[in-house]
């Protein structure tokens, strides 16, 4: 997609600023790079990088990456993979790659995450018709389109009672006829 030299490709994006570049670059363990890994500070670019042999305690697994790094972990079973995810803070996104609909549905239904894709990445961000947002430490609320408006709006519920009418059955003592009368309107 970006050729043999993505750092030279004008269509390949860069990291947002020097501080974030340094943070993301610091997550790359050179001993675990199987693809990419090169970086150019002058243009704030980091090659798409795949890390293999990653352990849960590695730095790259301790925070959200927000960069072109894909850590690969190996699991013996779907149960092990699901437990790995659910035992940690809720991820911002989850990408499931499987042709098996049962596997897809299992992760979509039972694993908490902010948003995601099945057999793709990032595309849930690309439309203003779908909300995007995290849960827990990864943020709350939904952004994009109508969801942004709703998230950043505060809906206030107000009752404005007329002062000229005060119905006495609202107040104690609460006789059984008052309970019956109220239930007619409440239920």
Residue ranges and their predicted role:
Residues 5-9:
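PAS and related sensory helical modules
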């Amino acid at each position: 997609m970006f050729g043999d030299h993505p750092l030279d490709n004008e269509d390949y994006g860069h990291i947002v600023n020097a501080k974030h570049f340094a943070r993301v670059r610091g997550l790359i363990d050179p001993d675990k790079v199987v693809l990419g890994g090169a970086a150019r500070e002058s243009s704030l670019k980091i090659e798409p990088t795949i890390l293999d042999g990653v352990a849960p305690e590695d730095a790259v697994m301790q925070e959200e990456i927000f960069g072109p790094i894909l850590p690969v972990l190996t699991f013996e079973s779907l149960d092990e993979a699901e437990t790995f995810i659910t035992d940690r803070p809720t991820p911002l996104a989850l990408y499931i790659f499987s042709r098996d609909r049962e596997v897809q549905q299992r992760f979509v239904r039972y694993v908490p995450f902010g948003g995601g894709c099945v057999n793709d990445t990032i595309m849930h961000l690309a439309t203003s018709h779908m909300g995007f947002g995290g849960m827990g430490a990864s943020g709350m609320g939904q952004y994009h389109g109508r969801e942004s408006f709703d998230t950043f709006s505060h809906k206030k519920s107000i009752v404005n009672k007329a002062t000229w009418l005060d119905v006495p059955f609202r107040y104690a003592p609460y006789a059984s006829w008052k309970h019956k009368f109220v239930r007619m309107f409440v239920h």
